[in-house]
C-alpha cells in the first residue's frame, strides 16, 4: 500500500490516493487514521487524507488523529492540490469536500483555496463563533499564541467541552500586531497544531470585522506565513510540500493496538530515504 507524506505550514498528513481503487475499506478508515497518525507506532501525522481525482475536480476526505472525520481542512486542501498537480500531472479547479465545493487556483508556488461558506455566525461573551468550513470559536488574546500557547490549553479545553454536545469546536486564538495576525488553533480531534488553515480564515474574518475592513490579511502561524484574501472568496493562500512517498509492508490492521509498525520510504540508490524536492 502506497502513501504520500505531505504538509501545509507544518500541518502534516498521510495522503492516500484512491482514484483507481479503494485502498482502505470505508469501515476501516477511522481505525486506519488512528494508527497512521500515531507518531510512535504508525507513520505520524495530524490527519489522513483520502482522495479521488476526476479532472478538473478532486474529492477529498480528511480524518483526524482520533479517527473522526472533518468536513474541511484548508492546509490539507492545498496539499491535495499540490499532489494532484505535481504527481498525477492533472489540473485542479474544484475541490469537493463534506463542506461543499471549493474553487482552487495555483499561482506559481502558491495555492489558493476558496472557503465560500466562511462567515461569522455569532458574537458571544468570550469570542466569536465562526463557520470556516468547520466550526471555530475565535478568541482574541494579548498573549502570543504561537510561542506561549501552553497557558491557553486549559481554557481551550473548557471552551471545547462546552461545545462538545454539538459536535465540538476548533478553538482559535488570535493576537493582532502592527502588520500581521498571529494565530494558533486547538483543533477538534487533534489538539494544538503548528497551523490550521480554516482557523486562519476564521481569525482573519474576525480581525477584519473589528479592525478593518481589509482586502487581505497576513497571518503568522507556528508553521509559517499564510495569506487570506477577503475581497474574493475568501481565499486561503499558502504553500504545500510533498515530503516523501512511502509503502506499508504487511497488514496495518495487525498493529492497531499501537504496537511498533514497519513502514518504508522510497529509497535512493544509496539506500537513504529519497525525499521529493518541493518546488
UniProtKB/Swiss-Prot annotation:
Positions of substrate binding: 11, 64, 74-75, 170, 187-188, 197-198
Encoding gene, per UniProt annotation: dapF
Entry function: Catalyzes the stereoinversion of LL-2,6-diaminopimelate (L,L-DAP) to meso-diaminopimelate (meso-DAP), a precursor of L-lysine.
Keyword hit for Electron transport: no
Keyword tRNA-binding annotated: no
One cellular-component annotation, GO: cytosol
Domain of life: Archaea
Name of this chain's protein: Diaminopimelate epimerase
